[in-house]
Amino acid sequence: VRHTLFETPSARGLTDAEMAAPLPRVRAVLFDFSNTIFEMINLETWLHRVGTASGRLALLDGHDAVAEISRQLRTAFRLPAVVALQEGRDLSPERHYRAMLGWWEHVDFLRGVEETAYRELTAPDAWGPYPDTEPTLRALRDRGLRIAIVSDFAWDLRIHLAHHKLDGLVDSCVISYEHGREKPDPQLFFTACADLGTDPRAALMVGDNPVRDGGAAACGLRTYILPAGSHSADRGLADILRLVT
């Protein structure tokens, strides 16, 4: 048995043979969803959809209307009561709905039309892929790799994949609300690997959150964390292809 003074935190105990063996080639890639391969439509587009559906579109005509709503959203999101509501919000649709309503009730434009706003948030076309999402998924597929999504999300994100005809490129979706767990809970990563029939040491986790997505490292996965991305620009996903060669 190999002993060490400083143990590396691990959710998966490795045998001595595994510790001594070289890392296997990457056979599967696990992706976070939000802000990794998909992003929500921009704020102005979402507000216009809410305004159209609720009869409040005229309220957005002012020169600084969107900027003021954005300011109120940021201010409200820092309120202690709103912060508390966000804790565990992706564990169930009900908790997420309450978290959003508790936030939006502090915003003049959204107060009273929160249900409409939520419907527009969760619409199939309210989330879209980055320009390099599909090419990267297809390139991984062409190399014979299995693909999963592991996401903290409070509704079925498969509707967004299907809307953009990308569902056929993903083998498994492990979504927090369906398991009653949020990342970095090890069980989510282990479940995805099991779904793909892949040893965690032969899997790569790609995300944008060092804590939540980086938690995959404690499960034996290699992990790649993307920097904060700009909207409507390549996400930098092509770099992943170099990691799986």
Language model features: what each stretch is:
Residues 2-134, 143:
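N-terminal helical cap/lid subdomain that shapes the substrate entry/recognition surface
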